[in-house]
């Protein structure tokens, strides 16, 4: 087993902010067995397999791959300018040219190891007979919330080829543009999270409506969850068939469930998705992100995913121990760290990488980038991360 990176005091001056000279793009940093620091050229993906995919599969890599959730978005000036020309989120996320342009904005500036499709977990809803929109300042709005058996019976199975051909087209273009220098990432919403939006009518603070359904009419909720399960499995396969090299499943609201309720209303459906995808796409890496999942951590590998993405409320070393050695991890720097000094950002990166170890780790935040994050700090995050060597 290779040694972890050296103590922070051994990092080069350009990382600690002590250098008075103008900052230049840093060399890579190799952490040798005796803790010395050497410069070398940064690693890139191969023609056969991107670095991110290699790391997830447990292959020996020189450094942890890095990308950031919401890396394409409102903190970037280029995105803000595009929004002025195209104020509708639905337009930005459903027009092939705009999806490709936005997805590539961080790639052109930061060169992350993962380029994630610009989209939304609710994008499939119209194809399931669930009208919605995303309203500025309010977020997603489900026009006719699903709160009765009759309403759930009207939900149809999602056929991505018919309803979101622009997703497939955009993924194919991204693969051509990125050319294995980074992994192209797709994503979907998890059944319970999608059901939460659709039953609540949008975002929620207390999730009283879906919990009322779960605890008084569970058969209705199970019917809805099964429809989302079948549909999201199909959607993942569609994304993979059109160029996605890994897919992340977002179960953002699963942490509103107690462990026993997670085992009934989320875990079996996630496992069913994974089992279905692995039957047809056994080599496709699947990542599961469940924000605030510290109380559920040991249950997440039971879904069968390849990677568990940790949020920042779980210590990386503790998370590794609790998850076990047979699963890769992603994360888990606090997004708020990107508002700190460059020296502090560097320290948190090294701390996370040291605790994660030198295998099966994808460096990321513990949540999406926050609005207002200084773009130069994001650039620094990528510079430092891509300079690390195991």
UniProtKB/Swiss-Prot annotation:
EC number: 4.1.1.37
CDD domains on file: URO-D (cd00717)
Major subcellular site: plastid
Subcellular location: Plastid, Chloroplast
Catalytically driven reaction(s): uroporphyrinogen III + 4 H(+) = coproporphyrinogen III + 4 CO2
Transit peptide (first-last residue): 1-30
Molecular function as annotated in GO: uroporphyrinogen decarboxylase activity
Tagged with keyword Chloroplast: yes
GO cellular component: chloroplast
Positions that bind substrate: 70-74, 89, 119-120, 197, 252, 367
Enzyme class (EC, first level): lyase
Repeat recorded as keyword: no
Pfam families: URO-D
Site positions (Transition state stabilizer): 120
Pathway membership, UniProt: Porphyrin-containing compound metabolism; protoporphyrin-IX biosynthesis; coproporphyrinogen-III from 5-aminolevulinate: step 4/4
Keywords: Chlorophyll biosynthesis, Chloroplast, Decarboxylase, Lyase, Plastid, Porphyrin biosynthesis, Transit peptide
GO biological process, one term: protoporphyrinogen IX biosynthetic process
UniProt-listed InterPro entries: UROD/MetE-like_sf, Uroporphyrinogen_deCO2ase_HemE, Uroporphyrinogen_deCOase
Function, in words: Catalyzes the decarboxylation of four acetate groups of uroporphyrinogen-III to yield coproporphyrinogen-III.
Family as reported in the entry's similarity comment: Belongs to the uroporphyrinogen decarboxylase family.
Assembly information from the UniProt record: Homodimer.
Protein name: Uroporphyrinogen decarboxylase 2, chloroplastic
Species annotation: Oryza sativa subsp. japonica
